[in-house]
Regions:
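Adenosyl-5′-phosphate
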Residues: 1-4, 21-22, 167, 176, ...
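Acceptor-substrate binding/catalytic loop of class I
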Residues: 332-336
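Short acidic/histidine-rich active-site segments
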Residues: 353-369
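Generic hydrophobic alpha-helical membrane-span motif
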Residues: 37-39, 146-149, 268-271, 365, ...
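A mobile, often basic/glycine-rich helix-loop segment
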Residues: 365-392
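Cysteine-centered catalytic environments shared across enzyme families
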Residues: 1-330, 342, 346, 519-520, ...
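Conserved A3 ("GATE") glycine/threonine-rich loop of ANL adenylate-forming enzymes
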Residues: 99-102, 124, 363-364, 389-393
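Short low-complexity, flexible loop/linker segments enriched in glycine and/or proline
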Residues: 324-328, 350, 373-374, 541-543
């Protein structure tokens, strides 16, 4: 696990080594154990390293045998050992046990597309082809690892950190009004956009090619979920896939643990992991209210599988102390309440392990969310999208069968999703039009006639990479903890999405196929228990937060976020507080947005100052073309 960063600057013709170092060290929490760089004229690349595999010899960059390919990576390639053996059979010589070295030789042997199609992992990759003078960037299939980029005439920059780019003097930090509109609707910014106009996100399953002589990115999709297939898989085959996925995610040269909520998904992972590594550490979080607390089930599972279990408590005082810390850990706003206890859990787990496995992805793959059960009666995605962007005739001009319910909670959880007027009052005239990415999304979804498959696929393309994995990555990396999601294995995802609807839902029972195979490892009490969901007493906590600030109105009036009418935000908050906090998700999303923006601007100002100092330092200092430690 690392953080990567790089620049191409043909305007200046070179990159200040001190500037590169400063950009790299923005990500020190992503990689506190080491660093590496590559400098050659107008091209500069660097990384911070969290040592997980081959602690002694895994420093980056890695080169091909001829030295013409330079490889950096953030993440893990889980099938690197199999790829390594194939390359060794082709007479490639390895000098380490690092998975990143496989990328350098694999690129030489198979090219970028051939390499990417062979990878099972979570990654953001940067590979420089010195022969063709091209930089290749790629992000993993399901968006587990972040990768941002920006470009202007003669300049291109990329990073695992959005902040590292936003502080560059040639990058505008203007808030994107359409992104603000989407945040108010969804509580995250989906797709290739970010909250800033000038900074884009590499999509999950996307790669970029950038010429070092003309650094304008060319975008290519190398992976798209296959829709339309329907295939039943035997319990034996599915169980073997899940077991192999967990086993591959246990590979590390540092201690590994499991986040154990007590629900089905994490319990399956913990049980398999405990079979592979007896007495493995497991971690759970509890709450004051029994209606929100699954910890008793987590303790039951931990006792059954014999894990070394650690339990932590989260309450209102934790909320008050952690909200500013969570906001500071984010480089983009995500209004997801669950990241608060997750931040705490990651902090405590890091005292015991360096890697933690979690159950992200299972609800999307095997249809675990409650709203999937109501998909047949939900309004269509297309109608919602049409309402959100103010196109009431959208359903008439496009196929009406696209999808039934994209959001991972009931519509009441996102009160502004279809309320265009409400969002316009909060954010002025920033009404978003349908983007090229959304048009492509709708066309892709139309390949499947199975509305349940389309609902899950929508979540896999939006909610999963742009909320769940952002939350998981940022909260874990804030504590230099590597988070891994075993269900997000290409074979498990493809197999799960292709299962017939009856293998996912049967009346009130969700995740039918996963529950059946879970009986191999877990007691019926856990296997048969309905999904509880992750719900915090946020309404009460928000009321207490704003009381401590004087009032909701006073809090928002005293703070400013470009693109938001703070007077209207204050009015909405005051009205909702007086009514008993009916729209707690919206209030939390607005509170998080404000806390994030205040923190981000403070960090950006300080980083910009450090960039200026670095840029004015003597360019004549001798810096090796490559280095690591």
């Amino acid at each position: 696990m690392c953080g990567i960063v790089g620049l191409i600057d043909i305007v200046e013709g070179s990159v200040s080594p001190r500037l590169l170092d400063t950009m790299r060290d923005v990500m020190i929490q992503r990689g506190p154990d080491g660093e590496g760089h590559y400098l050659d004229g107008a091209v500069a690349m660097a990384m911070r390293r969290l040592s997980i595999i081959d602690i002694e010899s895994g420093a980056q960059p890695f080169f091909s045998r001829e030295g013409n390919v330079v490889a950096f990576q953030n993440g893990e390639i889980y099938n690197y050992r199999a790829l390594r053996e194939r390359l060794k059979a082709r007479r490639y010589r390895f000098i380490s046990e690092s998975d990143t070295e496989v990328l350098a030789h694999g690129f030489t042997e198979w090219g970028i597309d051939g390499l990417l199609e062979r990878l099972d992992g979570m990654y953001a990759i940067a590979i420089l082809d010195r022969t063709e003078q091209e930089l290749h960037l790629a992000r993993d299939r399901f968006g587990e690892k972040p990768l941002f980029y920006t470009h202007a005439k003669g300049r291109f920059a990329y990073s695992s950190s959005l902040l590292a780019l936003a502080a560059l003097d040639w990058v505008s930090d203007e808030i994107d009004g359409e992104s603000m509109d989407r945040y108010l609707a969804l509580h995250y910014v989906p797709g290739d956009a970010t909250i800033f106009k000038a900074i884009k996100r590499v999509l999950a399953g996307e790669r970029l090619v950038i010429s070092t002589s003309d650094p304008a990115p060319r975008r290519h999709r190398y992976y798209t979920l296959r829709l339309g297939d329907e295939k039943k898989t035997s319990d034996r085959e599915l169980a073997a896939m899940v077991e192999e996925a967990v086993s591959s995610r246990l590979v590390a040269d540092v201690p590994v643990g499991v986040f154990l909520s007590g629900g089905l998904d994490s319990s399956v992972i913990a049980a398999i992991a405990a079979n592979k590594q007896p007495h493995i550490s497991t971690f759970s979080m509890g709450f004051d209210s029994t209606s929100h607390d699954e910890s008793r089930y987590a303790k039951t599972v931990a006792k059954t599988i014999g894990s070394n279990h650690h339990h932590f408590h989260f309450d209102e005082e934790s909320f008050r102390s952690l909200l500013p810390l969570v906001a500071s850990a984010l480089d983009e706003p995500v209004g997801d309440q669950a990241q608060l206890p997750l931040y705490w859990l990651c902090k405590e787990a890091r005292r015991h392990v360096t890697v933690a496995l979690s159950g992200e992805g299972a609800d999307e793959i095997f249809a675990g969310y409650d709203y999937y059960k109501r998909h047949a009666t939900a309004v269509t995605w297309l109608n919602k999208l049409g309402a959100r962007v103010g196109r009431s005739s959208a359903a008439e001009s496009s196929p009406a069968r696209l999808i039934d319910n994209p959001e991972p909670v009931t519509p009441s959880g996102f009160p502004l999703l279809t309320d265009v007027a409400g969002r316009q009052r909060l954010a002025g005239a920033n009404r978003a039009e349908i983007t090229e990415w959304e048009e492509g999304l709708m066309g892709w979804l139309d390949r499947s006639a199975d509305s349940l498959q389309r609902a899950a696929a929508t979540d896999m393309a939006t909610w999963l990479p742009d909320d769940l994995m952002v939350k998981f990555d940022r909260m874990s990396m804030a504590h230099s903890l590597e988070g891994r999601a075993p269900y997000l294995t290409p074979l498990v995802v493809a197999t799960g999405l292709a299962l017939p609807p009856s293998e996912k839902l049967n009346g009130a029972t969700s995740k039918v196929a996963l529950r059946r195979i879970a009986g191999r490892w877990l007691a019926p009490e856990i296997v048969e228990r309905p999904k509880q969901g992750f719900v915090l007493p946020m309404g009460k906590w928000l009321a207490q937060w704003f009381d401590a600030e004087g009032s909701g109105r006073e809090y928002f009036i005293a703070r400013a976020v470009p693109g938001l009418d703070m007077t209207e935000v204050a009015r909405v908050t005051a009205d909702d507080l007086s009514a008993g906090v009916r729209r707690e998700r919206l209030l939390f999303a607005m509170l998080l947005l404000v806390e994030w923006y205040q923190s981000f601007k403070s960090r950006q100002r300080e980083l910009s100052r450090r960039y200026r100092e670095a840029a004015t330092a003597a360019h004549s200092e001798h810096v090796p073309i490559t280095g690591s430690k």
